[in-house]
From Swiss-Prot:
Homohexamer. Catalyzes the reversible deamination of L-leucine to 4-methyl-2-oxopentanoate. Pathway: Amino-acid degradation; L-leucine degradation; 4-methyl-2-oxopentanoate from L-leucine (dehydrogenase route): step 1/1. NAD(+) binds at G180, V181, G182, N183, V184, A185, Y186. It catalyses: L-leucine + NAD(+) + H2O = 4-methyl-2-oxopentanoate + NH4(+) + NADH + H(+). This is Leucine dehydrogenase. Keywords: Branched-chain amino acid catabolism, NAD, Oxidoreductase. GO terms for biological process: L-leucine catabolic process. The lineage of its organism: Bacteria, Bacillati, Bacillota, Bacilli, Bacillales. It comes from Geobacillus stearothermophilus.
Length: 367
């Protein structure tokens, strides 16, 4: 990869390579854009096949966070960290302490949070070295587990998508096929069940499927069969890239709305489902509840305030649909356009994360 050429093409600001020989830390921090504020994005720990693969993942994820944070209406830019290693056996306290010192050295340009392969406990260790971390334990004034917040945002966005497709945002009696019944999807199923939706679920973990069947009266199907079931709404809540050449011909749903990241295998698949008349709620807009929740910590966490902001995902999805109609484009393109328009509006303004010469987090420290 020609790194500087790639950074210039996609407007990346900074890439930092971090290593600590004593702890075994090998990390890459990618900061894509800080026009709207400091870059916020989680720390992912994964056993990558190569350093180049890790770099590509960090860059891709950082850019995605710019769009997610902008579309969510947050005064935050986009960044991401990847730590190269097996989260099951390579973690140690010294590693996360060292990583926290690297974050502190960025002086607030990047704020981290948990992601795949990291936990709240890991964030607590990082917090010993830097204030620039969210998603720490509630006893430190944090929001705790972000899964319920993410699920509530998906639920709100799904209602907006239902209104677009069916003329009403009521989910009562609607058949929703949920792919994956992990932490986020479990809470989503609870919201859907309480409104009277009928659930079809699948997961490679039979225990979580059994729980959904018992608690929500869901119907269980084989993972390979979920795409072709008769349903009103398909909710991808597991792996990315599941809207692809193989799965699209099987789909019977009128709506796609779920919590999974990077649902479209390629952009052209968004074009295909658009031409089919399927209403697609873009993933990074509908699944922003978690990042909205942790971002509220920067102001001193207030659950009521955070949940009100998460409720607005309904409005954000409606805005995406309006832009799609206005410009005659697929919704995935409209989501990008909504985020880009907000960033461009602010590009010449003074960065909001410096207020009266002080970083936004100075308010949290003062409490």
């Amino acid at each position: 990869m020609e790194l500087f050429k790639y950074m210039e093409t996609y407007d990346y600001e900074q890439v930092l390579f971090c290593q600590d020989k004593e702890s075994g830390l090998k990390a890459i921090i990618a900061i894509h854009d800080t026009t709207l504020g400091p870059a916020l994005g989680g720390t992912r720990m994964w056993m990558y096949n190569s350093e180049e693969e890790a770099l590509e993942d960090a860059l891709r994820l950082a850019r995605g966070m710019t769009y997610k944070n902008a579309a969510a209406g947050l005064n935050l830019g986009g960044g991401k960290t990847v730590i190269i290693g097996d989260p099951r056996k390579d973690k140690n306290e010294a590693m996360f302490r060292a990583f926290g010192r690297f974050i502190q050295g960025l002086n607030g340009r990047y704020i981290t949070a948990e992601d795949v392969g990291t936990t709240v406990a890991d964030m607590d260790i990082i917090y010993q070295e830097t204030d620039y971390v969210t998603g720490i334990s509630p006893e430190f004034g944090s929001s705790g587990n972000p899964s319920p917040a993410t699920a509530y945002g998906v639920y709100r966005g799904m209602k907006a998508a239902a209104k677009e497709a069916f003329g009403s945002d009521s989910l009562e009696g609607k058949v929703v096929a949920v792919q994956g019944v992990g932490n986020v999807a479990y809470h989503l199923c609870r919201h859907l069940h309480e409104e009277g939706a009928k659930l079809i679920v699948t997961d490679i973990n039979k225990e979580v499927v059994a729980r959904a069947v018992e608690e929500f009266g869901a119907k269980a199907v084989d993972p390979n069969d979920i795409y072709g079931v008769e349903c009103d709404i398909f909710a991808p809540c597991a792996l990315g890239g599941i809207i692809n050449d193989q799965t699209i011909p099987q789909l019977k749903a009128k709506v796609i709305a779920g919590s999974a990241d990077n649902q479209l295998k390629e952009p052209r698949h968004g074009d295909i489902i658009h031409e089919m008349g399927i209403v697609y709620a873009p993933d990074y807009v509908i699944n922003a509840g978690g990042v909205i929740n942790v971002a509220d910590e920067l102001y001193g966490y207030n659950r009521e305030r955070a949940m009100k902001k998460i409720e607005q995902i309904y409005d954000n999805i409606e805005k995406v649909f309006a832009i799609a109609k206005r410009d005659n484009i697929p919704t995935y393109v409209a989501a990008d356009r909504m985020a880009e328009e907000r960033i461009e509006t602010m590009r010449k303004a003074r960065s909001p994360f410096l207020q009266n010469g002080h970083h936004i987090l100075s308010r949290r420290r003062a409490r």
